[in-house]
Design a protein with these regions (language model features):
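Rossmann-fold dehydrogenase core element
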Residues: 288-290, 301-340
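Glycine-rich cofactor phosphate-binding loops and adjacent beta1-alpha1 units
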Residues: 180-181, 194, 208, 224-312, ...
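Residue-level marker of beta-strand positions
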Residues: 80, 98-99, 113, 141, ...
Length: 372
């Protein structure tokens, strides 16, 4: 296997411009094609030749919204990565040649948080495109720790690049389902069911045996698709106030034969304030609200309602690497269908891909494939 002298990459050389007086971002970040040295690989580290990297909402937050990355620009974004191991440091030689999914969150596995089994929120975690130094997925290669890589033994005729979406879009909902203690027969509500994570949240919930699964979003065309991808019912929230949405939700619950205010597992997948407010407003007795999407806004909520309802609000960050093989199995067995929900484009189209992803008009997740 050929080992390059340089890594070809699309760096975010500058973050978005923030106007303090106006209190808002006035210009997006800047991307530049460049090359960076291949680092000397340490013990347990490998170099992965990237097959594909998904364009995620998190990347948009860094590039357009001013959410800070742990490593300051210049750095390369991108954390949904699949590829082939082409080189290794000491002790990781057996990984060479393996086709892998790179976890979006790679924990240290030695700290107190990791000892508690919450490795996905390790404070020393390495996340490509954020806290893995300058390295990210919109590149030809990436150096990563080997210990938590997910091996793909058989591609089953699917392009290796397509498996990139497992590294966040498909695994994040699985982690959220575990955090919610989701079980067969649980009623589920998903806000943002048409988004890059929401479409997989519905499929994961269905695989867990949840019923009914109700999805909310604002795009009618995408909502129709959601009915073929795990949802039993959908609600278009566009131009509706909370009371109208609540009445529609209650009618659906009645039709499905379940109580509208008892035991719902709610997955908020947008990170948008309006959707978060809906999710909070519909949280009822012994229910659980799992916060999956990230946003910078604040919400107003009477936390005494949690006491009165004996309800829970839970955060869910990324996914434990140990769950990746299970999600891979769900994809390969057909329980999670990824192929209709993605499209591959050459990485040279990254600037246009970012614009389209930021616009919110995409119907498929873009996976960029290196063409340096």
């Amino acid at each position: 296997m050929s080992i390059p002298d340089k890594i070809q990459t699309w760096q975010m050389v500058k973050g978005p411009t923030y106007d303090k007086e106006a209190g808002k971002v006035t210009a997006p970040g800047e991307l530049q094609k460049t090359e960076i040295p291949v680092p000397e690989l340490g013990a347990g580290e490998v170099l992965v030749e990237i097959a594909g990297c998904g364009v995620c909402h998190t990347d948009m937050s860094y590039f357009y919204d001013g959410v800070p990355t742990q490593t300051k620009p210049p750095l390369t974004l991108g954390h949904e990565i699949s590829g082939t191991v082409v080189a290794s440091g000491p002790g990781a030689e057996s990984w060479i040649g393996k086709k892998v999914i790179v976890p979006a969150v790679m924990p240290c596995n030695t700290c107190g948080i990791c000892d508690e089994g919450r490795n996905n929120r390790c404070l020393a975690q390495k996340m490509p495109g954020n806290s893995l130094g300058i390295y990210g997925g919109f590149s030809s290669h990436i150096p990563v720790p080997a210990q938590d890589l997910c091996v793909i033994e058989d591609l089953q005729g699917r392009p290796l690049a397509n498996y990139a979406v497992i590294a966040d879009a498909a695994t994040t909902p699985y982690q959220a389902a575990i955090r919610a203690e989701l079980k067969e027969g649980d009623p589920v509500l998903i806000t943002g069911i048409t988004g890059g994570v929401g479409v997989y949240m519905a499929q994961v919930a269905k695989a867990f045996g949840a019923k009914p699964i109700v999805g909310m979003a604002r795009n009618e065309e995408k909502l129709k698709r959601a009915l073929t991808m795990g949802a039993d019912y959908v609600i278009n929230t566009k131009d509706k106030d909370f009371k109208a949405i609540q009445e529609e939700f209650r009618a659906i619950a009645k039709q499905a034969g379940v109580k509208h205010n008892v035991g719902w597992k709610i997955f908020e997948c947008t990170g948008v304030g309006a959707a978060q407010d809906i999710a909070l407003g519909l949280l009822g007795f012994i229910g659980k609200l799992v916060v999956v999407g990230f946003g910078m806004q604040k919400n107003s909520y009477s936390i005494s309602r949690l006491m009165a309802f004996d309800a829970d609000i839970i955060g869910s960050w990324g996914c434990l690497p140990c769950y990746y093989p299970k999600v891979l199995e769900m994809v390969q067995s057909g329980k999670i269908d990824i192929d209709p929900l993605l499209e591959t484009r050459p990485m040279s189209q990254i600037q246009q891909a970012f614009k389209e992803a930021h616009s919110g008009g995409l119907t498929k997740r873009i996976v960029l494939t290196p063409d340096f």
